[in-house]
A protein has these predicted regions:
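Catalytic and substrate-binding clefts that recognize carbohydrates or anionic sugar/phosphate headgroups
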Residues: 64-199, 206-207, 212-213, 219-224
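Short, Gly/Pro- and small/polar-rich lid/capping loops
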Residues: 1-14
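Structural preference for beta-strand elements that scaffold enzyme active sites
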Residues: 199-201, 231
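A low-complexity, Ser/Thr/Gly/Pro-enriched, surface-exposed linker/loop concept
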Residues: 4-5, 29-68
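Ser/Thr/Asn(+Pro)-rich, low-complexity disordered segments
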Residues: 18, 224-225
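Aromatic- and carboxylate-enriched substrate-binding clefts and catalytic-loop regions
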Residues: 95, 103, 228-244
Length: 244
């Protein structure tokens, strides 16, 4: 793949932010952003994925407490309790600190997420309201993004499917600090690319059966008439249209 099409990534988290057992790995990316991985084979993913480009967050404070039942992890924002076994509703929970809600700021693994919604991939065939993917902010103070099925980005710019059966989750526990949640989301996933300047100028697009010669003549005519166009679109005739 050409170099200009490759995506810059820094997928390795600081080793000091990792709490790991034989079959699990918990990465404290920030005080409110926790990565949760579980693999029966003890194999974890350090490469970038379609979701996560940058896991190299700066060091943050956390505390690990070992108990008879497993481990507890405390940060300024969340309190995680885990029995160090396969993820389950009884064995993995995270409480968002700060008295966000009396009953709803505690998440157990497997519970349905009630957030404020994210985005939709396309508006094709939409007619009215459409379902949205999960977002990263919630009135309950937390949300969860499941990265278990994302494609992996390779160093040469191509992608490949992930190994099946590995759980890879990102827990966002920011309470009502929505701005900070979105800030860390954008760091993890990469900034949204800005539109190139030329795309903000005038466009010419017409569904018309041009030839190469007639299209070039049209561009020259625009130039002669001092009509400023920064983008010229061939419309549908860049591919076959008469296929019957």
């Amino acid at each position: 793949m050409q170099e200009r099409y490759r995506v810059q990534t820094r997928p390795m988290a600081l080793s000091s932010q990792i709490v790991q057992g034989d079959k699990y790995r918990i990465t404290i990316l920030t005080e409110g952003l926790i990565r949760l991985e579980y693999s029966e084979e003890g194999v974890f993913e350090d490469r970038a994925t379609k979701l996560a480009f940058f896991r190299d967050f700066p060091k943050c404070d956390y505390r690990v407490v070992h108990t008879e039942d497993g481990i507890e992890i405390h940060t300024s924002r969340v309190h995680l309790i885990y029995n160090e076994k396969e993820f389950s509703s009884n064995g993995l929970s995270i409480q968002v600190k700060g008295n966000i809600s009396v009953y709803h700021s505690l998440w157990h693994y497997g519970e349905e997420i009630h957030d404020l919604g994210g985005t939709a991939r396309t508006l094709d065939e939409a007619d009215g309201a459409i379902p949205l993917d999960h977002g990263v902010v919630s009135g309950f103070g937390y949300s969860l993004l499941d990265d278990s099925e994302s494609q992996v980005l390779l160093e040469d710019g191509w992608i490949e499917p992930r190994k099946k059966g590995i759980k890879d989750l990102y827990f966002f526990g920011y309470g009502h600090d929505y701005k900070e949640a979105l800030k860390d989301f954008y760091y993890l996933c990469g900034q949204t690319p800005m539109l190139p300047r030329y795309a903000l100028g005038n466009w010419w697009s017409r569904y018309y059966k041009y030839t190469e010669e007639s299209y070039m003549e049209l561009m020259e005519r625009f130039d002669q008439e001092n009509l400023p166009f920064t983008v010229a679109v061939i419309d549908m005739d860049w591919h076959l249209v008469d296929i019957d």
